Amino acid sequence: LTAAYTFGESGLTLSVADLWWAGQGRGKYFNFKSHETAHHFEAGLAYTLPVEKFPLSIAWYTMFAGMDKKLNDKGEEKQNYSSYVEFNYPFSLKSVDLNVTCGIVPYKAARQYNCNGFAVTNVALKGTTAIRLTDKFSLPVFAQAIWNPRMEDAHLVFGITLRP
């Protein structure tokens, strides 16, 4: 669940998200107690550079409450404030809209991102185009290759977009 607000044409977006990663049948969804919940509450700030020929966007997300914990020197569980930073660069080639993504974990976030320090955790390329089916209808399709070098994990995602 995400709530976001974009500040006019400034390129700045502020967001707050409630992320649920426990999985089906694990944890109680409506339990929001700090040391029991499976929710992660995250604040985000995104900015797109106001340069038409270089529309790079930069986003920083930090978990500020919920399950994102670490043990301090006394062995007490404390909020970890795990963060993720993402850079996106959109561009087009012929009739295909492309987006290159690079995501990093800037510092230790062992429990959430399995990182003991700075790590590249997301490298992706997404392509979107429309397949013309009739004179009046085109089907928007996309394909995305995603790689997490830190986890040595890769995914291919394909999809369609239906609009009224």
Walk through the language-model features, giving the residues of each:
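Outer-membrane pore/translocation modules
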Residues: L1-E86, Y113-F118
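Short loop/turn motifs that connect adjacent beta-strands in outer-membrane beta-barrel proteins
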Residues: T6-T13, P50-L56, P90-N99, T128-V141
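Transmembrane beta-barrel strands of outer-membrane/channel proteins
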Residues: L14-D18, I58-T62, V100-I104, V141-W147
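Structural signature of outer-membrane beta-barrel domains
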Residues: L19-G23, M63-M67, V105-A109, I146-R150, ...
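A C-terminal functional module that forms or caps the active site or interfaces directly
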Residues: V85-N88, N99-T101, V105-T128
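Surface-exposed beta-loop-beta
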Residues: N114-N116, F142-V157
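Short, solvent-exposed linear motifs at loop/edge-of-secondary-structure regions
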Residues: A119-K136, P149-M151
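Outer-membrane beta-barrel "beta-signal"
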Residues: L125, E152-P164
